[in-house]
């Protein structure tokens, strides 16, 4: 395993969620800040800004079920609601009742669900009060969300279950890498080393076999769109959007 990635894992710990091990990191001092990572990687996404954030906040960064260093069960109903439950359970486990949120990609949808619960006081675990939310690129509005064709085929059709059997093949990696690179700007494309690290994260605990199942969160975006957007329109929680305009899924066309 890459040394920096291994160091990230060694600095973390696990808690039990529904009988599964969920990886998370906590560091820093100050107001609690919950980081909700994107799909299909994990909390290591935050590594470049981790030192800066931990200077000002007590930072909590879990890996969602099916991703990163957390459990990746095959027989599991992955959903945005379940991811939201896990984040609430973790904060409750840590004795944290309020937090700022920084969310990205699928994390935006999880943040929207947490916000909707916050507005009516109906949390699954604990009594989380949201101090603020900062949204990074993510499909918060399905009418402007344009997922890649491969993601739609793998996540919204039976092809996902069929192709999951060959997800660990070299061909699968070659097909995935252009999609990943497309998410980056022209001056920030991942190096070969970074792509190798991404592949290590996906391969950990045979994670590619559930990649398409986790990716079905895009269906939740359609199902719960009105409830989530209503919460955003009605809330008094301070919000900010930081949007990379070149993102083909949710770039300038969403902002």
What label would you give each PLM region?
Residues 39-50:
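The serine-hydrolase catalytic nucleophile loop
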Residues 1-13, 20-22, 32, 40, ...:
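Flexible "cap/lid" subdomain of the alpha/beta-hydrolase fold that forms the substrate-access gate
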Residues 48-57, 93:
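A short, Lys/Arg-enriched amphipathic alpha-helix followed by its capping loop at the start of a domain
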Residues 16, 25-26:
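Well-ordered beta-strand positions
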Residues 27-33, 57:
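Proline/glycine-enriched tight loop/beta-turn segments at coil->beta junctions
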């Amino acid at each position: 395993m890459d040394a920096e990635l291994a160091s990230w894992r060694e600095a973390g710990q696990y808690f039990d969620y529904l009988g599964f091990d969920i990886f998370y990191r906590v560091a820093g001092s100050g107001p609690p800040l919950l980081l909700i990572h994107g799909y299909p990687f994990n909390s290591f996404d935050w590594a470049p800004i981790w030192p800066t954030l931990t200077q000002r906040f007590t930072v909590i960064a879990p890996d969602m079920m099916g991703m990163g260093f957390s459990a990746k069960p095959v027989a599991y109903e992955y959903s945005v609601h379940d991811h939201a439950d896990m984040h609430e359970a973790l904060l409750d486990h840590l004795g944290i009742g309020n937090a700022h949120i920084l969310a990205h990609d699928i994390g935006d949808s999880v943040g929207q669900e947490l916000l909707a619960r916050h507005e009516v006081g109906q949390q699954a675990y604990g009594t989380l009060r949201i101090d603020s939310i900062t949204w990074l690129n993510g499909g918060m509005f399905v009418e402007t969300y344009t997922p890649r064709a491969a993601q739609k085929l793998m996540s919204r059709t039976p092809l996902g279950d069929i192709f999951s059997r060959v997800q660990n093949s070299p061909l699968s990696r070659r097909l995935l890498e252009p999609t990943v690179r497309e998410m980056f700007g022209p001056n920030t494309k991942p190096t070969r080393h970074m792509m190798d690290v991404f592949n290590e994260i996906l391969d950990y605990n045979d994670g590619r076999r559930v990649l398409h199942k986790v990716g079905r969160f895009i269906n939740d975006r359609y199902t719960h769109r009105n409830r989530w957007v209503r919460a955003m329109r009605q809330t008094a929680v301070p919000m900010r959007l930081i949007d990379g305009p070149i993102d083909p899924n949710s770039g300038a066309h969403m902002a």
